[in-house]
Amino acid sequence: MEEGDGGLRSLVPGGPLLLVLYGLLEASGGGRALPQLSDDIPFRVNWPGTEFSLPTTGVLYKEDNYIIMTTAHKEKYKCILPLVTSGDEEEEKDYKGPNPRELLEPLFKQSSCSYRIESYWTYEVCHGKHIRQYHEEKETGQKVNIHEYYLGNMLAKNLLYEKEREAKENEKSNEIPTKNIEGQMTPYYPVGMGNGTPCSLKQNRPRSSTVMYICHPESKHEILSVAEVTTCEYEVVILTPLLCSHPKYKFRASPVNDIFCQSLPGSPFKPLTLRQLEQQEEILRVPFRRNKEEDLPSAKEERFPAIHKPIAVGSQPVLTVGTTHISKLTDDQLIKEFLSGSYCFHGGVGWWKYEFCYGKHVHQYHEDKDNGKTSVVVGTWNQEEHVEWAKKNTARAYHLQDDGTQTVRMVSHFYGNGDICDITDKPRQVTVKLKCKESDSPHAVTVYMLEPHSCQYILGVESPVICKILDTADENGLLSLPN
C-alpha cells in the first residue's frame, strides 16, 4: 500500500496504511461492507480533493461502489473502491472451452521433453512420462558413464486415471492452486509423478514429483525451476503457452489498485491523524548523524545470521545453492577465524542446509520446529588422510594470466570418515573445492553441494575472502595466513 501523492509508503501491499485507516476510520454506507483485502492485491489510497474524475481505463470503478468513512474526529470521507475481480470472474464464468488437461494433451502426445542444464546435473522432463536427473562422465577411449535418478514416472494407465480424476475434480471445485513466482501468486496445473528411484534417506521409498504447469505466452515449455521441497520429493515448474487460453490460468500482472477518498463538506483534505502520522515520518526520515567514535566498528560486534535465498529466475544454478552474508569483521580477523575453523560457512536452499568449518568438518542438516535438528556428518578433517589423497589427486589448480604468470585458481581438500552410507555401507566422504569469488559484496559466500556418486560429495565454497589466501596454498593445497 502506498499513498498516491508521495506521502506515506509501505512495501507490504494492503498493509500498514490500510491498517492505519481502519484504526482511524469507521465505515458506514447503507449495507456496504469493507472489501476483502489480500496481500496478493496491492492497493494505494489517493486523496484527490473535490475536483476529481474517475479513471476510464484500467481497473473498473462505479460511482455507487463506495464506503463512507468516519474518523475518530468525526471527519467524513467518501472512498470509491475498485472492482478488482469483476471482469475476470465474468470471463471465467462464460468459458466453455477445453479443461487444462485437454489443453496440455498435445504436449503429452508429442513425446516431447524439456531440459534444464546446470553446472553438474541435467534435468529431463518428458511430459506425461518421466522426470530424470542425470550426469554424464566421458573418459578418453571409454564408454560414457551415466549417473542418474528418476524423480518420477507416469505409466499410461496412470495418465488416463489422472485425466479422468482431475477432470471431475475441476468440475466440482473452482479452486485453482497457486504458487509464488517472483512475488506473484500464479495459478498452476499440477501433474503428479511417482515410482521414481528408491530414496535411501526415506527407507528406500520411491522418489516422487509434482510438475506444475503455468501459463507463459512466449514460452516453449521450458523448465523454470527444480526444487527438492522435502527429502526426495520434488517440485518442477514448467512454463507453457498451452494453458494461456484458459481464463483461470492466464498470466496476469498485479497492478496497484487505487482507492480514491474524497472529503465530504466540513472535513479537511486528509484526516488529521493521518497528517500527524506523515509529519512524524518526515521527522524520522532526517538522517541520524553519529559522531566519529560511533562510526568505528565495535570489537564485540555480533555476526549477522546466515540468510539463505534461491538464485534468481533466469540464472543457471546448481540444484542446491545458497548465498549468505557474513559479519563485518575486518578481513584479517575473518581470515584468522576461518582458517582456525571457528568461523563456519553455511549455505543451501530447500530441505537440506550445509555447514563447512575449515579443517574440522562438513555437515548436512535440516532444522524443523517440531522435530528439532537432523544432522548428517558428510566428512571430517584428517590432515594425514588429505595428504595421501593429494598425492593421487589435484589439490591445487592454477590459472594462467595474460602475462604468463600462474595464480592459484582453486584448492581441493579431502574430508572422510563421515556417517555410514545406507547404500554403500561405507563412510560418507566429500571433496571441498575452495574458489575465489569476484563480487561487489566482499562478504558474500556461495555454498553448493553435488553428489556425483552415492554418498561421495563435492562441496563448492566460493568467496572474495578466499581470494586473499589461495596463493598461500602449498603443494598439498593447505592454506595459511597471508604475509
Curated annotation (Swiss-Prot):
The places in or outside the cell where this protein is found are: Endoplasmic reticulum lumen
Name one process (GO BP) from the record: ERAD pathway
Going by the UniProt annotation, this protein carries glycans at: N195
Q: List the disulfide bonds.
A: C113-C126, C199-C232, C215-C244, C344-C357, C421-C455, C436-C467
Domain MRH, chain residue ranges per copy: 111-246, 342-469
Molecular-function annotations in GO: unfolded protein binding
Q: Which UniProt keywords apply?
A: Disulfide bond, Endoplasmic reticulum, Glycoprotein, Repeat, Signal
**What PTMs does it carry?**
N-glycosylated.
Q: What is its main location?
A: endoplasmic reticulum
- Spell out the InterPro entries in the cross-references: Man6P_isomerase_rcpt-bd_dom_sf, MRH_dom, OS-9-like, OS9-like_dom
Alphabetical GO CC annotations of the entry are: endoplasmic reticulum lumen
Q: What does this protein do?
A: Probable lectin that binds selectively to improperly folded lumenal proteins. May function in endoplasmic reticulum quality control and endoplasmic reticulum-associated degradation (ERAD) of both non-glycosylated proteins and glycoproteins.
Q: How does it assemble?
A: May form a complex with OS9, HSPA5, SYVN1, and SEL1L with which it interacts directly. Interacts (via PRKCSH 2 domain) with KREMEN2 (when glycosylated). Interacts with HSPA5.
Q: What is this protein called?
A: Endoplasmic reticulum lectin 1
In its UniProt entry, the species of origin is given as Mus musculus
Q: What is the lineage of its organism?
A: Eukaryota, Metazoa, Chordata, Craniata, Vertebrata
